[in-house]
Amino acid sequence: MASTMTPYFGIVVSLIAYGIGTFLFKHSKQFFLFTPLFVAMVLGIGFLKVGNFTFEEYNTGGKIISFFLEPATIAFAIPLYKQADKLKKYWWQILSAIIVGSICSVVVVFIVAKAIHLDTAIMNSMLPQAATTAIALPLSESIGGIPAITSFAVIFNAVIVYALGALFLKTFRVKNPIAKGLALGTAGHALGVAVGIEMGEVEAAMASIAVTVVGVVTVVVIPLFMPLIA
């Protein structure tokens, strides 16, 4: 069992699971349940369970991949640079919309968790789900949450937005590209950005800035709820 403690174990499991997810997504005409992140998560959990491996054994290498999540978010700056003129022109409206959306997300999760009497650890795990994984996981751990539950919540949330985001926008007749991008990024994280890229450069840029600002707002807002949870 000592060999499974090397970093290669977690890295290889992660890459293979993600590779299978990418293959299934591509050959299923992008069926939303085969989103690579979701498939990788399900396969990874299944493999660890069937092989009777512990999370610690996996995470020896898994945390190396997690480390690169944070610098990878720098890539969001590319579409932002291309749409700098719109950011300067509508910066107040953009920031206001993202901040309100972020706070609403945290408040709704808090109210629902309280209403159904969720365990404190689970509640703390769910609160950061508004942020992207790179921010949500360390935040969850810092407030006494369970990162694994947080990861599931973030990814599941993003998959829903990836699958139904465009439909929701069409149903509610949201036609402004800036509004579309902000909605997708605020609700769907990186997968929301992916949908934005499919729609256009403006949507992609707005979704990218939403992911970044939501993370900052979540980090600031969630500690304010801690006295209410304790």
Curated annotation (Swiss-Prot):
It comes from the Bacteria. The chain crosses the membrane at residues 5-25, 31-51, 61-81, 92-112, 149-169, 177-197, 209-229. It is found in: Cell membrane. It holds the Pfam family LrgB. GO terms for cellular component: plasma membrane. Keywords: Cell membrane, Cytolysis, Membrane, Transmembrane, Transmembrane helix. One of its GO terms (biological process) is programmed cell death. It is a multi-pass membrane protein. Belongs to the CidB/LrgB family. LrgB subfamily. Inhibits the expression or activity of extracellular murein hydrolases by interacting, possibly with LrgA, with the holin-like protein CidA. The LrgAB and CidA proteins may affect the proton motive force of the membrane. May be involved in programmed cell death (PCD), possibly triggering PCD in response to antibiotics and environmental stresses. This is Antiholin-like protein LrgB. It comes from Bacillus cytotoxicus (strain DSM 22905 / CIP 110041 / 391-98 / NVH 391-98). The gene is lrgB.
